[in-house]
Regions:
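Conserved catalytic-core segment of NTP-binding enzymes
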Residues: 107-199
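Walker A/P-loop phosphate-binding motif and the immediately C-terminal alpha-helix
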Residues: 2-40, 113
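Conserved GTPase G-domain substructure that encodes guanine base recognition and part of the catalytic core
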Residues: 217-227
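P-loop/Walker-type NTP enzyme "switch/lid" segment
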Residues: 32-114, 196-201
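Conserved beta-strand scaffold positions in the cores of enzyme catalytic domains, especially
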Residues: 2, 34-36, 84, 186-189
Length: 227
């Protein structure tokens, strides 16, 4: 299965969602480790591990003949169940941008790998090309029930297959309002639980994933993989 996680703006929780999905899918899989492709460079911080030191997606894109299998091989093992591929040259201060053709090639590679294992791409606020979304099994837009976030999300929501809603207290809008605004179903709703932020701050998500984070996403993954 190939999932892309993205958002209309930074700071809404996309990397946390992608990291939790990767761990959950990897632990449940009998087909080898899950892969997270980390375009924003924040997945290691969420998992509490070192940054990948080898080549990443940027180097893979820079080689026109590189295969999908070679993309998988540059992943850094985080656990027996999870590998992380960094952005590589894309993460440099003046790093390369991904062209529409690059997005499509990258998407085809992820779709190929997703036939045998689980691939999660953390695109953050980097807006993938339409062809990339179309190649994914699930395109999950991370959003909050906040006017500013929803306003930015509306023009982009047509690319999403569903919404992961981070539910913050104090907002008057609920799940139904978000679905009506974006025209897509809310597939998982994550609470703003202090246990989640504390685990991230302490670098313990990889060792002890908070139930408040895993439980809502596990319901989605069990349906998505048909288990």
């Amino acid at each position: 299965m190939f999932i892309v996680c993205w958002s209309a703006k930074g700071g809404v929780g996309t990397t946390t969602v992608a990291s939790a999905l990767g761990m959950s899918l990897g632990q449940a899989s009998l087909d080898g480790p899950a892969i997270i492709v980390d375009l924003g460079g924040d997945v290691p911080a969420v998992l509490g591990v070192s940054d990948p030191s080898g080549p990443g997606l940027g180097e893979w894109l820079g080689s026109p003949t590189a295969s999908a299998d070679s993309l998988a091989r540059i992943g850094t093992p985080v656990t027996d169940d999870l590998h992380v591929i960094g952005a590589g040259a894309l993460g440099a201060p003046s790093g390369q941008q991904i062209s529409d053709d690059g997005w499509e090639r990258f998407g085809r590679a992820c779709a190929h790998l997703g036939e045998e294992r689980h691939v999660v791409v953390d695109a953050g606020p980097m807006m993938p090309a339409a062809a990339f979304h179309a190649l994914a099994d699930h395109s999950l837009l991370t959003a909050r029930a906040c006017y500013v976030v929803l306003r930015r999300s509306i023009p982009m929501a047509l690319h999403a297959t569903g919404i992961v809603l981070v539910a913050e207290p104090g907002h008057s809008m609920g799940t139904t309002d978000v679905e009506r605004s974006l025209g897509r179903p809310v597939l998982a709703e994550l609470p703003c639980d202090p246990a989640i932020s504390q685990a991230i701050d302490a670098g313990l998500v990889n060792a002890r994933v908070p139930h408040a984070l895993v439980r809502p996403l596990r319901r989605f993954t069990s349906v998505a993989v048909g288990r």
